[in-house]
């Protein structure tokens, strides 16, 4: 040991270099262990909707169009909003876990569940009136009627989806994501059987796919809830139901509201708005058939970024947080190059996954290069958005996204798509312009960040949470 210290003193540069290399290697391993499962979870949960629509496709083109439009409408008005709301947990749970205030995670999850359940009530009313909204925005009445019916049968899904998002982020903050992968895998596998029974055998027709979504989401919630309740790995973070979850709702909402209007809502809303607008183009089926699955890869990286940054800030390690940002951005660049290259290489054959119609195949082939560019830009900004959530910059992120998408992206996309008759390409070019503006703004914010100050903010946030926890224990408000 003494000789090793003498060597370090004699060769300070070499020792420092080896130390940095070890830290980088450890950070890479941590993020791979996080991002890999998170990508799998995103893909598996996204596949629920895809599988449902695929089964509906066997019933004809009209039910397929209706289910696709209803799914997009549900995403705009429900799923994305709840996903954005739940992302507030990335900040509070991640930083509390990093600060070793484990008991606060359970209270924060319960508080988030309460808020998301209450928000689901008005959102379900919106879903019940889907047909009227679609007709108002100019959709074909026959498609709007079927879409409205599909959306009404999806209403039970929204309550389960909110709870599922809370459970996912509760475990993600603890770097415990393998159970989420397993439960999602089991649910998605069973979803195929459930869809087959309800869509093709029960007589429910295309409405059976919506019912299948609800069953599968609730099944996933039950599986994860059982894990949290009975697993020893959650014994410190889940200490039972607490009355304290009902306290400090207003301060929590100050983080929830900008979270809901950040990446998971403003960005997704703009994207889904353009998808719904594509239904007003001459061939809506073609415009809504473009692949979105690859977006789940940077979304998984974003989850890893928010978790690692929030954990390091909570533990009082500014250098660790900065290193986490550098590593995840490197992952993002590599991923965007690989996926973009693959999309371009398969552009002439990917269309056959949707149809044997030469028009469809040709259309998809012309769209994929644009999608490849969009994905590369989206990967970069999605990861930066994860960094923002880990730091608690939701308000800043909301304003950046508002300007990027609604002052630049959506107007430019609609202008190209409809006024200049560029079609679906114009809509996607609008999204690309928004991604460029968003990426530049978030990059500048991250580059000029004072990480020591961010640690102080995280410490203050975790300390206030700890005081709430101590109050809860002293007043006997922790319930079994």
Swiss-Prot record:
The chain crosses the membrane at residues 36-56, 69-89, 118-138, 143-163, 180-200, 208-228, 255-275, 294-314, 326-346, 360-380, 396-416, 428-448. It comes from Arabidopsis thaliana (Mouse-ear cress). GO terms for molecular function: antiporter activity; xenobiotic transmembrane transporter activity. One of its GO terms (cellular component) is membrane. CDD domains: MATE_eukaryotic. It is found in: Membrane. The lineage of its organism: Eukaryota, Viridiplantae, Streptophyta, Embryophyta, Tracheophyta. One of its GO terms (biological process) is xenobiotic detoxification by transmembrane export across the plasma membrane. This is Protein DETOXIFICATION 15. Pfam families: MatE.
């Amino acid at each position: 040991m003494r000789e090793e210290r003498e060597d370090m003193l004699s060769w300070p540069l070499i020792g420092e270099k080896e130390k940095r290399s070890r830290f980088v290697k450890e950070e890479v391993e941590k993020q791979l262990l996080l991002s890999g499962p998170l990508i799998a979870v995103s893909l598996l949960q996204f596949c629920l909707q895809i599988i449902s629509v695929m089964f509906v496709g066997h019933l004809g083109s009209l039910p397929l169009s209706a289910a696709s439009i209803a799914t997009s409408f549900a995403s705009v008005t429900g799923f994305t909003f709840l996903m954005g709301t739940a992302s507030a947990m990335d900040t509070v749970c991640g930083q509390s876990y990093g600060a070793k205030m484990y008991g606060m995670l359970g209270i924060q999850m319960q508080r988030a569940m309460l808020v998301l359940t209450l928000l689901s009530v008005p959102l379900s009313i919106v879903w019940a009136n889907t047909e009227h909204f679609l007709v108002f925005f100019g959709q074909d009445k026959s498609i709007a009627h079927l879409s409205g019916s599909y959306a009404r049968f999806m209403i039970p899904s929204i309550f389960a989806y909110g709870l599922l998002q809370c459970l996912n982020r509760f475990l993600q903050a603890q770097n415990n994501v393998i159970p989420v992968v397993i439960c999602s895998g089991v649910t998605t596998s069973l979803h195929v059987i459930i869809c087959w029974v309800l869509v093709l055998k029960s007589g429910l027709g295309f409405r059976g796919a919506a019912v299948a979504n609800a069953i599968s989401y609730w099944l996933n919630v039950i599986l994860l809830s059982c894990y949290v309740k009975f697993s020893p790995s959650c014994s410190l973070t889940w200490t039972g139901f607490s009355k304290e979850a009902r306290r400090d709702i207003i301060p929590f909402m100050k983080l929830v509201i900008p979270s809901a209007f950040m990446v998971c809502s403003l960005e997704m809303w703009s994207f889904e708005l353009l998808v719904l607008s594509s239904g007003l183009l001459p061939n809506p089926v073609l415009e809504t058939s473009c692949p979105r699955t690859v977006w789940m890869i940077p979304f998984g990286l974003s989850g890893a970024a928010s978790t690692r940054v929030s954990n390091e800030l909570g533990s009082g390690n500014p250098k660790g947080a900065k290193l986490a940002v550098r590593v995840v951005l490197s992952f993002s660049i590599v991923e965007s190059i690989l996926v973009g290259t693959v999309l371009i290489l398969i552009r002439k054959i990917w269309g056959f996954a949707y149809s044997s119609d030469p028009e469809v195949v040709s259309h998809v082939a012309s769209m994929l290069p644009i999608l490849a560019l969009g994905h590369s830009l989206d990967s970069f900004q999605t990861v930066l958005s994860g960094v923002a959530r880990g730091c608690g910059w939701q308000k800043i992120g909301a304003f950046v996204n508002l300007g990027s998408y609604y002052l630049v992206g959506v107007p430019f996309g609609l202008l190209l798509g409809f006024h200049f008759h560029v079609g679906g390409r114009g809509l996607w070019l609008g999204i690309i312009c928004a991604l460029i503006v968003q990426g530049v703004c978030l990059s500048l914010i991250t580059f000029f960040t004072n990480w020591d100050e961010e640690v102080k903010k995280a410490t203050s946030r975790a300390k206030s949470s700890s005081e709430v926890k101590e109050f809860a224990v002293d007043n006997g408000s922790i319930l079994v």
